[in-house]
């Protein structure tokens, strides 16, 4: 809902928005047919572990422990492997408190993570688990990524961060990043915006859908 000026008022032109609000409405959720499950077949080569279920497959590099491939048939989705990521875009407030300098060690921590172990095991005939354990260069911290691939083609990714000590610099964020091939560019973001929406600017941010540039 919007409230705006019907007529010009001093310096404010007609149509100037004065207030806005959003309310939640019930939404229709279409029926989605249940996906049939298939057996998960593992191809454990010297440098690559490939798991296949039906026409879907995922691949893991044994040297890095990273997810490097996700295919539907012959179509590859991934351009750059999934990796830990502890950095985010710097805001004006961040620049003011020097965050881009004091927290800089986290910027490349994901790329510099060293693989300690990569464990794999079948969970019955229709599921497989891969767990990659990394040591981070910041404070000797640990980062564990657990992948669960099911016979329905679902890939669940769970991450665990274990701080190495109590004196680590503040963590800008904790997550992973991945780069898809360029044909997968039609993405949309549902969230608050369009400007930054930290707690000091959250009221003016409404939920909206924004397409990728």
Show which residues each predicted segment covers.
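Short, aromatic- and glycine-rich surface loops/edge beta-strands on solvent-exposed regions
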Residues: 1-5
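Short beta-strand elements
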Residues: 9-32
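Beta-strand/loop-rich accessory regions of lumenal/periplasmic or secreted enzymes
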Residues: 28-210
């Amino acid at each position: 809902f919007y409230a705006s000026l019907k007529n010009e008022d001093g310096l404010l032109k007609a149509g100037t928005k004065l207030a806005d609000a959003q309310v939640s409405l019930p939404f229709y959720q279409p029926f989605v047919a249940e996906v049939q499950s298939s057996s998960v077949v593992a191809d454990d080569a010297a440098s690559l572990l490939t798991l296949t279920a039906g026409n879907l497959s995922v691949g893991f590099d044994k040297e890095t422990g990273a997810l490097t491939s996700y295919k539907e048939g012959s179509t590859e989705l991934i351009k750059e492997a999934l990796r830990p990521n502890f950095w985010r875009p710097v805001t004006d407030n961040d620049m003011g408190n020097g965050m881009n300098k004091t927290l800089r060690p986290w910027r490349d921590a994901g790329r510099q993570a060293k693989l300690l172990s990569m464990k794999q095991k079948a969970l019955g005939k229709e599921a497989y688990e891969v767990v990659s354990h990394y040591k981070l260069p910041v404070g000797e911290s640990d980062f564990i990524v657990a992948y669960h691939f099911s016979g329905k083609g679902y890939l669940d990714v769970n991450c665990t961060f274990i701080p190495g000590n109590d004196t680590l610099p503040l963590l800008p964020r904790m997550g992973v990043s991945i780069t898809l091939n360029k044909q997968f560019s039609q993405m949309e973001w549902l969230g608050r915006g369009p400007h930054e929406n930290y707690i000091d600017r959250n009221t003016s941010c409404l939920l909206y859908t924004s397409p990728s540039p």
